Amino acid sequence: MRSGLRVLLGLTATVTLGAGIVVPAFTASASASSTYAAETWHWGPTASTDYKGWATGKIRSTSSGLRVSGDLYDAGGARTCSWVKIKWLTDHGRYRTATFKNCSQSTPRAFSVNTGYMLSAEAKVCRGTSTRITGRCSGWEGVWSQGG
């Protein structure tokens, strides 16, 4: 469907009336080269093994690669936090990680990381203190892979 729209963006249709008058039926003003259509993939929820922390999110294409974003929820007790760890494989064959925490116990925390061009991404949710992950982690869940 998107490739069909790209073809139509550069075309102008005309309708010929009975008296030989040609009237433009529609005119597409945007060209395919000036328009950038971002794609979005959703993932989650991924939960810690005690189900007191979970994360959901999306991966969105940008002009400089991909962006992984989402919300981290914390339903744990006092002095505990939920952590989400994102791991991705770059197009250069290197693994990178980003870690985010939420200690609010009531409000989801938004997170976002620009990954650039990547081959795959995984996420896991853990429990911990305000300074480090202590355990009760989910397994690595594949959230995005190039080619499906």
Residue ranges and their predicted role:
Residues 31-148:
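Post-signal peptide N-terminal regions of Sec-secreted extracellular proteins
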Residues 1-52:
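N-terminal prepro-regions of secreted/extracellular proteins
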